[in-house]
Amino acid sequence: MSYEVEMKFPLPTAADLDSLRERITQFGAIAHEPLDQRDLYLAHPSRDFVQTDEVFRLRHVGEQNYLTYKGPVIDTETKTRREIEVAAASGPTTAAQLLDMMTSLGFRPVGEVVKRRTPFHLWRQGHEVEIVLDEVHGLGWFVELETITDETGRVAARECLFELSRELGLGKSERRSYLRLLLGDDPHER
């Protein structure tokens, strides 16, 4: 079973962003091309994902489509949760068909997050860590630290990210999702 261990931090100014980019590369992280991502979040027909702390989304990265399920967060300091992501066929026709299938099954769209993501990768303490700089429409800039691990590696992965966040000089992490931040603290208001 795979678990995503994640920490997210807001970046208040452009100077913070430039300084962080420099620090990331000093750690030997390898930069990759920026990606445009569009995430459509779906509500389950008979389960309140806000109450169960689950996520189901359709993600578009360029022409590629992904369906992702994230289970409840199981850590009080990071966003550690089970994650299942399945790549689907590419293209807008497939995206429309996937959405049609989901809505036919009773799922309904509840919100969309659009971002430009610049990923960096590095190996640290035996973990492949992805550091991403996200420019989220309507929210601004954030940095995420993320790694995927199995159940036995969760504690070590968490400590790896804590140490990296301290060394990068990141402040207090933001545990709310981009969708929750965009919708406000109470998603039932919309």
Give short role names for the model-derived ranges.
Residues K70, I74, V136-E144:
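Residues forming anionic-ligand binding surfaces in small-molecule and nucleic-acid pockets
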Residues L11-T13, T147-G153:
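A generic structural motif
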